[in-house]
Curated annotation (Swiss-Prot):
Pfam family, one: Cys_Met_Meta_PP
GO CC field: cytoplasm; nucleus
Cofactor(s) demanded: pyridoxal 5'-phosphate
Keyword Signal carried by entry: no
Region called Disordered, residue ranges: 1-41
Species annotation: Neurospora crassa (strain ATCC 24698 / 74-OR23-1A / CBS 708.71 / DSM 1257 / FGSC 987)
Protein's name according to its UniProt entry: Cystathionine beta-lyase
One GO term of the biological process aspect: 'de novo' L-methionine biosynthetic process
Family: Belongs to the trans-sulfuration enzymes family.
Length: 457
């Protein structure tokens, strides 16, 4: 059989045909094809979390893991969409487009941890820039800001960001960044983000309002919708939901701002790995059902503790001083709460007596965790500063998972009794605190009223 001349019409036709086929003889679009909607969200958020619009050339129902450091180019000039995974990877691109959709963002970027995300954001600052932030911050955030203050010439103002007037008094044309958390961790205080964003931009239109949305996730709150310029989250928490990866995400609407953040990620090499991008994408799909169960459990546990006389901090309780403000912005209360016992040693005994509640830092995973922030997650903040910021040394943080609520309450009850945190009565128990005594007295009065009224029924 003769071979057609390379210049013959038959040879040219063959080249055109086979240039479109892959090694298996398939003439299909490259993988991955662009994901996420082009015209905004089209379905309910719970649906969008699952619907990824993946168009793999082989019909894979899950996004492929492109575990490759380099990508071959079609010419000596390069120019292909991907060349080196530090700069970009198809798996990471799918994740980022999907996250942008659910975070109501124009662009989303993913990095190796939540603190990595904040590090990228703070590289927008230069010596002499002024930052306003809260007095109840995650310990890692406080550590990074302290470093920038002591070593990079950045001026950091810590104020009570739950008090808009306190923020207003500090804001000036020199303000470059306002960094907010809501709810705060672990005091569960609420910031009025729309108002703070407005007064910040009025003082300096170039200032950026940054919001750490880790405590709520995109399922419950979208800060970009209420005036924030940058939103970041620890993907390790609710987005992943299983504490088997570390990740951070950054969301913006401003294209120029997004380009600056991407430049830093590419330059420093902190982009999320392909495998972790795959795992985070998998976790995001179940965010709605996990958060629904975790919130329901957290609400029951918060009500249980409060009914027995403990001072509980949780925005799902109407006793929370900023209950109305929280619900004016958010779609849920989250699954992190804290309570006080009045005694550090007592709190330590409660934490160590728990069985189902794992003693650990972090939150947002399917299993429930218990900790003393002043001993663990916020230990990097010195005792003097904690006292100045009115952070109780005895405070216990509960990060509620998806277990059976009755089991969690039973285990917590046993820990409270074993630790000596409650006084047993014929009607149950109440906390050995002023609040607990008041609750017990109210219960006794109610019982007496019921007894007196009984004969007339």
């Amino acid at each position: 059989m003769s071979t057609p001349n390379s210049d013959s019409p038959a040879a040219q036709a063959a080249k055109k045909v086979f240039s479109r086929l892959d090694l298996d003889g398939h003439n299909l679009p490259p993988s991955p094809a662009p994901s996420s909607p082009h015209n905004g969200r089209r379905y309910a958020l719970a649906t969008e979390l699952v619907y990824t619009e993946t168009k793999d050339q082989y019909g894979a129902s899950s996004i492929p893991i492109y575990q490759s450091a380099t990508f071959k180019q079609s010419s000596s000039n390069g120019g292909s969409e991907y060349d080196y995974t530090r700069s970009g990877n198809p798996t990471r691109t799918h994740l980022e487009r999907h996250l942008a959709k659910i975070m109501n963002a124009n662009r989303c970027l993913s990095v190796s941890s939540g603190m990595g995300a904040l590090d990228v954001i703070t590289r927008l600052l230069k010596p002499g820039d002024e930052v306003i932030t809260g007095d109840d911050l995650y310990g890692g955030t406080n550590r990074l800001l302290t470093y920038l203050k002591n070593n990079q010439g950045v001026i950091v103002h810590h104020v009570d960001t739950t008090n808009v007037e306190s923020v207003r008094q500090i804001i000036s044309p020199k303000t470059t960044m306002v960094l907010l958390e809501t709810p705060t961790n672990p005091l569960i205080k609420i910031c009025d983000i729309p108002t703070i964003a407005r007064i910040t931009h009025e003082a300096n239109e170039k200032a950026v309002v940054v919001v750490d949305n880790t405590m709520l996730s995109p399922m419950l709150f979208n800060p970009l919708d209420v005036g924030a310029d940058i939103v970041y989250e620890s993907g390790t928490k609710y987005l992943s939901g299983h504490h088997d990866i570390m990740a951070g995400v950054i969301a913006v609407n401003d294209t120029e701002l997004g380009d600056k953040l991407y430049f830093t990620i590419n330059a420093t090499g902190c982009g999320l790995s392909p495998n972790d991008s795959f795992l985070l994408m998998r976790g995001v799909k179940t965010l709605a059902i996990r958060m629904e169960k975790q919130q329901a459990n957290a609400q029951r546990i918060a009500e249980f503790l409060e009914s027995h006389g403990f001072k509980v901090r949780y925005p799902g309780l109407k006793s929370h001083p900023q209950y109305d403000l929280h619900w004016s912005m958010a779609r849920g209360a989250g699954a992190v709460l804290s309570f006080e016992t009045g005694d550090v040693a007592l709190s330590e005994r409660i934490v160590e007596a728990a069985r189902l509640w794992g003693i650990s830092v972090s939150f947002g995973c399917v299993n429930s965790l218990i900790s003393m922030p002043c001993r663990m997650s916020h230990a990097s903040i010195d005792a003097k500063t904690r006292a100045e910021r009115q952070m109780p040394e005895d405070i216990i943080r509960l990060c509620v998972g998806i277990e059976d609520a009755d089991d969690l309450i039973d285990d917590l009850s046993r820990a409270l009794v074993q630790a000596g945190a409650v006084t047993l009565t014929v009607d149950g128990f109440h906390a050995n605190t002023a609040e607990g005594a008041a609750a017990a007295a109210a219960g006794s009065e109610a019982a007496e009223t019921t007894t007196t009224a009984a004969p007339s029924l």
